[in-house]
C-alpha cells in the first residue's frame, strides 16, 4: 500500500527531505519519480538485495 510505504519512509528518511503526498503519487504511478521523493523512498523501502557468500 503506497500510503503505508510512504508513511514508513517519512519516519526512516529525514522528514524535511520528503513530501509524503508526492511520494504517494509517485508510488501510484501518477507522477514521475525522477530525482524526487519516490526515488529516495525506494532506497529505504526496497533496498537492493546483497548477494551473500554461500
Swiss-Prot record:
Keywords: Calcium channel impairing toxin, Disulfide bond, Ion channel impairing toxin, Neurotoxin, Pharmaceutical, Secreted, Toxin. Salivary gland. InterPro entries: Opioid_neupept. GO terms for molecular function: calcium channel regulator activity; toxin activity. It is found in: Secreted. GO terms for biological process: neuropeptide signaling pathway. Its main location: secreted. It comes from the Eukaryota. The two short analogs SOR-C13 (AA 42-54) and SOR-C27 (AA 28-54) bind to and inhibit calcium influx through TRPV6 expressed in HEK-293 cells (EC(50)=14 nM and 65 nM respectively). Since TRPV6 channels are overexpressed in a number of cancers (including breast, prostate, ovarian), these analogs have potential application as diagnostic and therapeutic tools to detect or treat TRPV6-rich tumors. One of its GO terms (cellular component) is extracellular region. Disulfide bonds join 2-23, 6-27, 9-41. Belongs to the opioid neuropeptide precursor family. Member of a multiprotein complex. Paralytic toxin that immobilizes a mealworm for 7 days. Inhibits the transient receptor potential cation channel subfamily V member 6 (TRPV6). This is Soricidin. It comes from Blarina brevicauda. The lineage of its organism: Eukaryota, Metazoa, Chordata, Craniata, Vertebrata.
Amino acid at each position: 500500500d503506497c500510503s503505508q510505504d510512504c508513511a514508513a519512509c517519512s519516519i526512516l528518511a529525514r522528514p524535511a527531505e520528503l513530501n509524503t503526498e508526492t511520494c504517494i503519487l509517485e508510488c501510484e504511478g501518477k507522477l514521475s519519480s525522477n530525482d524526487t521523493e519516490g526515488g529516495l523512498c525506494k532506497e529505504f523501502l526496497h533496498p537492493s538485495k546483497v548477494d551473500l557468500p554461500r
